[in-house]
């Protein structure tokens, strides 16, 4: 149940009845403070201005038409014309019952869409590094949320599997007589890449051979395609280990690398020329865009084919968007790519729209993100100043979590300890990232992310086990509990219930904006409200069975909400800490 949507509909109807236009926005929001009720309708200001009347006067007229019987216990006008809505305890109790009766906690499913989500995108012949973390885990949280809401999600791992470097790599592979690249560890392959590059820079004959190999690879020569495939396979096999460690849902089947779009590129260049969008300029094929200006204030030229006939990333991105609409039948396409690529994407998509490859009705959304920084505020590096490998980061997370967990659980079996350390360590790295607004840079800090206080994975995982501990202590008759009514009589019960019932609203925001930090903030809030409820509203020592069972049901919905919410983030819960 989406209470915000229900109230929006009711307030909108009342506004129209009071003389507002049919497209009026009620602007129903969750209230920031308890004294303002559970929800506020803030839309009177804008509409009253259009109608030439005072907002408070409009609010008074709206109230005469607003029927919230059975939903709100009190509705009042505040300030210049805000409408504060206080939910009826009986309504909250009924909604809690309905949520508990559903595996989905009463979350409805919107109209099903086909949504393509582009995320992770590592490069072939290179090991994943910390720069891939944000795209991979933020994108995966979006995918999990969209799938939970019932959408058909197509994961698109836009792997860097094409380019001139492959001639160099194949030539070096051949020179070293290492055609069995599929048996090499990726760490070796990365060293192999460095050696190949060094040789390419220093040996002109080798470089010439590498350039010839690129031509042969691009012309589809069987031998060179086979060598290229080996390099791709070993890379993706190793990357899959990282995805599995991160509890990310990407698989080999989701790879849609740059090479996929190669056959489309000549046709796209020819079509853009035929449509008068692309022209020859200094030997290259260029699209001049009025929407983007160069330093002189003239339309910016975007090259789609170099004078030597080679294509650019922009050409591939145009083909990519076209493919996702025409072949994958996307209703919406989300790109989890860092903010530095924004202008590049906007230029490609402007060309896509002008060419008519993707209609305006299909959103192409750049869900950009900032950088991961060290404590010094600079890009996160090793002590030696090198790039941090993602596998090394996860190893350290596991080691730190192992020490932390062993300290708190000296009697835990080695097997159990390892499972718990994995959930806490990997969860801590992911949650530290997901809990920050993706558009900003954030400081990577081991001490903060592994703390048991504050908005961290260990705190959230502990909060979940704390709720479960109530049920371990209680001698519960499952059947009696299922049929027991929910009674909301205390303020803290009402506050917890109202927040729990905002789960669907939170999911809706995350799905619309691609902002998992909103889910993190919501779950942290729920954990805090449960803590206050637990301290002030005795559960197991309640005054009678009816109150005890009702409070157990609130605890039950809290546990289910925390577990399901953390699952949409890809954070593992544990039964004991």
Swiss-Prot record:
Motif ('HIGH' region): 122-132
Domain of life: Bacteria
E.C. number(s) listed in UniProt: 6.1.1.19
Family annotation (SMART domains): Arg_tRNA_synt_N, DALR_1
Annotated keywords: Aminoacyl-tRNA synthetase, ATP-binding, Cytoplasm, Ligase, Nucleotide-binding, Protein biosynthesis
GO molecular function: arginine-tRNA ligase activity; ATP binding
Species lineage: Bacteria, Pseudomonadati, Pseudomonadota, Gammaproteobacteria, Enterobacterales
GO cellular component entries: cytoplasm
Keyword Ligase on entry: yes
Subcellular location: Cytoplasm
UniProt record similarity statement: Belongs to the class-I aminoacyl-tRNA synthetase family.
Protein's name according to its UniProt entry: Arginine--tRNA ligase
InterPro entries: aa-tRNA-synth_I_CS (IPR001412), Arg-tRNA-ligase (IPR001278), Arg-tRNA-synth_N (IPR005148), Arg-tRNA-synth_N_sf (IPR036695), ArgRS_core (IPR035684), DALR_anticod-bd (IPR008909), Rossmann-like_a/b/a_fold (IPR014729), tRNAsynth_Ia_anticodon-bd (IPR009080)
Subunit architecture: Monomer.
GO biological process: arginyl-tRNA aminoacylation
Enzymatic reactions: tRNA(Arg) + L-arginine + ATP = L-arginyl-tRNA(Arg) + AMP + diphosphate
Enzyme class: ligase
Cited SUPFAM superfamilies: Anticodon-binding domain of a subclass of class I aminoacyl-tRNA synthetases (SSF47323), Arginyl-tRNA synthetase (ArgRS), N-terminal 'additional' domain (SSF55190), Nucleotidylyl transferase (SSF52374)
Predominant subcellular localization, coarse grouping: cytoplasm
One Pfam family recorded for the sequence: tRNA-synt_1d
